[in-house]
A protein has these predicted regions:
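Short active-site loop/helix that positions an aromatic residue
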Residues: 104-109
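Surface-exposed amphipathic alpha-helical tracts and adjacent flexible/coil segments at the periphery
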Residues: 1-26, 30-33, 37-40, 54-55, ...
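Aromatic- and glycine-enriched glycan-recognition loops and surfaces
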Residues: 43-52
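Short, polar loop motifs at secondary-structure junctions
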Residues: 99-103
Length: 653
């Protein structure tokens, strides 16, 4: 079931079912979560039982559950993946998010399919092809600008999904192989080693140092708060928050922030609506700056900018809160712009390194001045001079609000009570239009105090506090003011609410697999390099079916043994350091950027620059010891050392 053209979907991440529930309660219209396997997040999997219990919880609010199955699959994994998809379909999940086109060749139920960001969707041609082969929703590349987003929206009937917040992969998604080349851990299989967060020294083609030991491939975090209206106008309808590794506080906070932002836009513009049911009330003030982030950027949505990198540190340093005045043996004295509290997380930057500590005890010593006793005094603090900047990356009092009930979500219901003295008829109608009728037989006499009786009936019917509903309207259509004992009225109302729950769940309609277009589409390329991530025979059959003639194996197949682009990125270090030939020359024919090098210890990577599309290619070579390892996902690779030990003959004696 695609998102209607005027409905906006806020899509939140969930590491587990508990976080998924809180995401929904804090305003998510849909949640994406990993299943038992193949979910592109190595340590964020969930059992079928947990997902099966999560689905009806979500559907009571009209919210959807999307399960990620977005790794590339080895041939040995196809049958287990097929079984898993069948099991997931039976739990009632709404859609699968997939990368591997081999899945479309499997014998699977008619479940709705979404194209993962790992599919690297940057062009109109590719987006239209994926829509035509059966994808209902497509996640576009984070690097696209508003004009490109609009062009894709206008060319396809697929729902456009776009990341609006969270960590940014420096490479185009699905186009990063540096982790596998260096460690054997494949990003396309959910096990990225995050080489992009390491410090590097940048050298020019003469070996001169341009930048020394900075985190040159580490991006700031995505934040599209200011661009939501423009993204809506460009055709985005699903607004995705990154973060399936993030904790509950992060998901609560960021979901609440974007719920409020989108609700304000919906209220202001009469042509939009949210994609699920209910209204959400938050019991805290959301702040994108108080949970993990590396600084904020809107990336390339409006234009290329020079400050998209978090070069100093990939860690969360928080907000400036003051200055260190003095460092003593067991405490520090600080001047601050905001009050401090016991338990706050504080830090200073020393030589590009974050030196952090937890405030065990704080004591106010003067106006805007505190004495802080850390839980453990970092030795490096004694190296700083007076007036060194102080940051806070954990606001203890604010975080405490998130550990409690921090949101409430309720669905509107209209209540009508009719009938006569021998039978009461109660009708509940939800905001989606689902209606139930419940009757109560008895002898209900006229009340002595008509006004009081009518008020009691209205108040009693509106008491929905133990349900997910709130009374939008209460209408009494009785021949007179009848007296109904509170105990009977309460039971009557509770039974009706349970009936409405069941009716709404029964009326919920999930989407199904979109049929392939007729005539069948043709893939826009006839030759696929390893960058297409084709790792199994079913994926080969898929691409051959749609006109591809020559298909190279995925990088994880270990057929690319020489130097190749192990990362392709829109981030350009020449641009970041004002060394871009485009900045200096106006003639496109004269653009020529000489290679550079990134150095981390013994690891040397060559940087090549493709100036026409403004891309940087990080060139590397897979390590020899990785070539000798079993292919990721193969039966051999899945056998653990303990399993191998069990096959050895036992020693005698």
């Amino acid at each position: 079931m695609t998102v209607s053209s005027h409905r906006l979907e806020l899509l939140s991440p969930a590491r587990d079912a508990a976080i998924a529930r809180e995401a929904i309660l804090h305003g998510a219209d849909a949640v994406y979560i990993g299943g038992p396997g193949f979910g592109a997040r190595h340590n964020a999997s969930n059992s079928l039982k947990d997902i099966a219990e999560l689905v009806p919880f979500a559907h009571r609010y009209g919210a959807k559950i999307f399960v990620t199955l977005n790794t590339i699959l080895h041939d040995d994994e196809l049958e287990p993946a097929q079984r898993l998809i069948t099991d997931l379909y039976q739990t009632g999940v709404d859609a699968l998010i997939v990368q591997d086109m081999g899945i479309l060749e499997l014998d699977i139920p008619p479940i709705e399919l979404h194209a993962s960001t790992q599919c690297d969707i940057r062009t109109v041609e590719k987006a239209k092809f994926l829509s035509d082969v059966g994808f209902t929703q497509i996640v576009l590349a984070r690097e696209l600008n508003l004009e490109q987003l609009r062009a894709i929206h206008q060319a396809t009937d697929a729902t456009i999904e776009f990341f609006i917040h969270g960590a940014l992969c420096v490479a185009y998604s699905g186009q990063c192989y540096i982790s596998h080349a260096q460690t054997g851990r494949s990003a396309n299989r959910g096990d990225c080693s995050q080489a992009c967060r390491l410090p590097y020294t940048l050298k020019d083609d003469q070996g001169r140092v341009v930048s020394y030991e900075k985190h040159l491939l580490s991006m700031k975090d995505n934040d599209q708060t200011a661009n939501l209206g423009a993204l809506i106008d460009a055709g985005v309808r699903s607004f995705k928050i990154e973060g399936r590794y993030k904790d509950m506080s992060y998901v609560k906070n960021i979901t609440a922030h974007y719920r409020q932002m989108l609700d304000a836009i919906i209220e202001e513009r009469g042509d939009l609506a949210r994609a699920s049911s209910g209204r959400t009330e938050h019991f805290f003030v959301p702040s994108t700056e108080k949970t993990f982030h590396r600084g904020s950027t809107d990336y390339f949505v409006n234009a290329r900018k020079g400050d998209i990198g978090a070069f100093d540190s990939p860690k969360f340093i928080g907000l400036p809160v003051g200055k260190v005045l003095k460092v003593a043996k067991d405490h520090i004295d600080v001047a601050v712009t905001e009050p401090l509290a016991n338990g706050d997380g504080l830090n200073v930057m020393i030589k590009r390194e974050v030196v952090g500590f937890r405030a065990n005890t704080v004591e106010k010593t003067g106006e805007n001045q505190y004495r802080v006793w850390p839980n453990e005094m970092p030795a490096d603090l004694h190296k700083i001079r007076p007036h060194h900047p102080l940051n806070r990356n954990l606001d203890h009092n604010w975080q405490q609000a998130l550990t409690k009930t921090s949101s409430e979500r309720r669905v509107a219901v209209d209540i009508e009570l009719g009938g006569w003295q021998e039978q009461l008829i109660l009708t509940l109608t939800s905001e989606e239009g689902v209606s139930i009728t419940h009757t109560l037989d008895g002898q209900f006499d006229e009340a002595n105090n008509a006004e009081k009786a009518m008020n009691n009936l209205k108040d009693g019917l509106a008491k929905l506090g133990q349900t997910i509903y709130y009374a939008r309207n209460v209408q009494i259509n009785l021949p007179g003011a009848l007296f109904v004992p509170n105990s009977l009225l309460n039971q009557f109302r509770r039974e009706a609410a349970d009936m409405l729950d069941a009716a709404r769940l029964a009326s919920y309609q999930r989407g199904s697999r979109k049929p392939v277009a007729d005539p069948a589409p043709v893939y826009p390329q006839t030759h696929l390099s390893f960058l297409a991530n084709v790792y199994n025979q079913k994926a080969r059959e898929f691409y051959h079916r749609y006109g591809v003639q020559l298909i190279d194996a995925a990088y994880e197949a270990h057929e690319e043994k020489g130097e190749v682009p192990v990362m392709i990125t829109k981030h350009c270090l020449r641009f970041a350091f004002n060394l871009c030939p485009k900045q200096a020359k106006g003639n496109i024919k004269s653009w020529k950027a000489t290679p550079m090098q990134l150095v981390n210890g013994d690891e040397v990577l060559t940087l090549k620059f493709d100036c026409r599309p403004c891309e940087m290619h990080v060139i590397g070579k897979i390590k020899n010891h990785i070539l000798k390892m079993p292919l990721p996902g193969s039966v051999v690779a899945s056998v653990s050392p303990d399993d191998l030990l069990k096959t050895l003959p036992k020693r005698k004696g």
